[in-house]
Amino acid sequence: ASCTERKHDCTKDRHSCCRG
């Protein structure tokens, strides 16, 4: 997942920049 993807996709891939 990248930072442009939906937060639930980012969080499961541990993208902290999306978790905010």
Swiss-Prot record:
Subcellular location: Secreted
Keywords assigned by UniProt, alphabetized: Secreted, Toxin
Gene Ontology cellular-component terms listed: extracellular region
Signal peptide as annotated in the record: none
Tissue-by-tissue expression: Expressed by the venom gland.
A GO MF term: toxin activity
Major location (coarse): secreted
Function, as annotated: Spider venom toxin that exhibits cytolytic activity by forming an alpha-helix across the membrane. Lethal to insect larvae.
Family to which the UniProt record says this protein belongs: Belongs to the spider toxin CSTX family.
Protein name per Swiss-Prot or TrEMBL: Toxin CpTx-4a
Organism: Cheiracanthium punctorium (Yellow sac spider)
Higher taxonomy: Eukaryota, Metazoa, Ecdysozoa, Arthropoda, Chelicerata
